[in-house]
Regions:
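Short glycine/proline- and aromatic-enriched beta-strand/turn motifs that initiate or cap beta-hairpins
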Residues: 25-78
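Flexible, solvent-exposed loop segments that connect beta-strands
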Residues: 109-122, 187
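Detector for outer-membrane/organellar transmembrane beta-barrel domains
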Residues: 117-182
Length: 234
């Protein structure tokens, strides 16, 4: 297991630092497209749970070739020491289906850490198998399925989330309902853990630059908690 995971990470690094000539369009090899973004969030909320108890900067980068995407995502507190996060993923899209493997890694920046520790009993990594079913343009529903199959969750939790998307001019709305079907990672039993709505509005700053601003209201019935989070994407 460790060798396979290290090989995956090595492949990710090759994509990220490869020669720029790899990104050129040729007759025999489709172009590799890349993307990068930085989100500034008032809080880091993921699937109904709060992480860090502070504002968060969340960088992301990815490279896509044909229907394969490999990328990295992180969440780091803007104030104070504590738990930080660096994630890697590999996904494949087939029609309305997207399959992905995620490697979530949480670490404390005040203690020694070992990114390459994948021992089942001591690792801070969490490996997830994920599938997303998209309804497409004619059916604005998505269904997300997640299975935490290795690492820091010994209960091997299963999480399901139904999403509904709606657009009105420059404003996008997404309603979501997340349910823990198995395990104890998100709550103590099978229950709804992530209910709410996200609104994203694009604000024109100049003729050539716009700024996406998001507001999310989240309710976690299992923890009896609510969050109202603001964010911008750079």
């Amino acid at each position: 297991m460790r060798d396979k995971i290290v090989a995956f990470q090595f492949m990710f690094l090759l994509v990220c630092i490869g020669s720029p000539s790899l990104y050129a369009q040729t007759d025999s090899l489709p172009a590799i497209s890349t993307s990068a973004s930085v989100d500034l969030m008032s809080r880091y909320i993921w699937r109904g749970q709060e992480y860090g108890q502070a504002s968060s900067i969340q960088p992301a980068m990815s490279a896509t070739w044909k229907d394969f995407t490999i990328g990295a995502w992180g969440a780091y507190k803007l104030t104070g020491a504590g738990v930080q996060e660096t994630d890697l993923y590999l996904s494949k899209t087939i029609g309305h289906l997207t399959f992905a493997i995620w490697d979530y890694w949480n670490f404390c920046d005040t203690t020694s850490t070992d990114f390459f520790n994948y021992n089942q009993k001591t690792t801070a990594h969490l490996l997830e198998a994920q599938v997303l079913i998209s309804g497409g343009e004619n059916l604005p529903f998505n269904l997300l399925g997640s299975y935490l199959f290795y690492g820091a969750d010994p209960s091997k939790s299963i999480y399901l989330e139904l999403q509904y998307q709606y657009s009105a001019g420059s404003t996008e709305l997404q309603f979501f309902s997340g349910f823990q079907a198995k395990g104890e990672y998100y709550g103590q039993n099978s229950t709804f853990v992530n209910l709410g709505c996200t609104m994203i509005k694009t604000i024109d700053v100049t003729d050539r630059w716009c700024l996406p601003v998001s507001l999310s209201f989240t309710v976690n019935p299992s923890q009896k908690s609510t969050y109202l989070v603001a964010g911008i994407t750079l």
